[in-house]
Amino acid sequence: MAQQPLSSSAQPTDIYGGDEVSALVLDPGYCSTRAGFAGEDVPKSILPSFYGHVTGDNSRDLFGDECLIPRENYEVRNYMNKDSVVEDWDVAARIWENMLVNRLQPERQTPPSKNGLNDDPRPEGQDGEGDVAMDDAEAESMEKPLGENPLLVTEAPWNTPKAREKAIEIIMENWGCPAFWMSRTPVLAAFAAGKATSLVIDVGGANTSVTAIHDGMVLKRSIQKSPVGGIWLSSQIRSLFETSEPQVELTPTFMIENKTPVDALSSPSVRLRNFPYSITDSFRAYEEERVLTEFKESVVEVWRGPGRYSVPGNEEFVKTQPGRVFEMPDGYNQMWREQRFRVTEGMWDENAGYPIPEADRLNKTQTIPELIRAALNAVDVDLRGNLLANVVVTGSTSLINGFNDRLNTELMAMYPGLKIKIHAAGLTSERRFGAWIGGSILASLGTFHQMWISRKEYEENGPNVVEKRCK
């Protein structure tokens, strides 16, 4: 049973007194990490979760825009795995601290005892009017980077107890936060949409998850996840380029020295840069992913229906419709018509996508309709109608044109007798940052103050308190 919050009269007033709390919200993901102040509309600080590592004698790590500059002996890595669970805690702590402290906090003032303004030249033992004494506890609190900021951190619904305990340990021990909370991303996305009960479909960069939320709690048996996300779509686009006639060369922007405009389908007229060192595969793949992301955002579309895209006649119909032109970094450009629909079709029909390596291929249970079916089959029959009337769509990959229309078509075909209502934020930022916005709302509520895990509670119970409190 979850621990009951203290009554408001018993709350420590230094943390819980009043509605004004300078709380921070941190939302780590596989593709990017978001951070900002509770109560604001969007995160103030957004950094890639990828970082650069220079090997050799001058070994070091590089974050943010520094990752985009090619270097010798330079690898691009990620501190998370594709399940959105932290793997490299040393790097994670450094990235998070950089975002929460260096980017969000004002420069800290030097303590009066150390700024030299109160030094008194008189001999020891004589009182000096300007002397300022500071006890050890006060000095320590001044040195902790987040000593005045409660912190709410989001997590994937399948996050491990070990990872949760490691997070609170870093935040309390290293940063000195006065209070902490950890909340699952589907719950926060539902809060951002104003729903306490909902079916949350989160289509992110590394994976897609479907989770049933009832009265603000995750129904754990309903949690379903699949690798069908933005990275998987990128593998479909690579396959499209490789099987096109003519074959499309994927040359990342950093390799282009100059280019000349050419007609559609003509070979590119480009001069490539020469580097005095070899470019690593990981850096090239990272730069190629940026081009593929641009292609996804501007060209790729989801077939809305009726029926599946593979139904005879649908592809012929699409060929008669206006296409979209995309220019590659090297200047090659082409009109894309039916191909841009087939790229996303594998999300809904495992047999309809482009051929990709066996390791990345989806089976039927990993498609979005089957994830939804499995999630709903795992919950009580009486809840299903309420969940389908409150479907919340979030995640940046859900912004692909036509996604919500196709989702509605699939749900109506699967559950013809039930009312289907999809809630998807219209603003791009609200869809991309749904979990962060939910955390921002939650951490800024006066009624939530009594829920924080205080520093005193952490010191009494240890890191395991996060498992007991954050259900």
Swiss-Prot record:
Subcellular location: Nucleus
GO (cellular component) term, any one: nucleus
A GO BP entry: chromatin organization
Primary localization: nucleus
Origin superkingdom: Eukaryota
Paired cysteines (S-S): none
Record-linked PROSITE patterns: ACTINS_2
Assembly mode: Component of the NuA4 histone acetyltransferase complex, of the INO80 chromatin remodeling complex, and of the SWR1 chromatin remodeling complex.
Stated name of the protein: Actin-related protein 4
Organism: Gibberella zeae (strain ATCC MYA-4620 / CBS 123657 / FGSC 9075 / NRRL 31084 / PH-1)
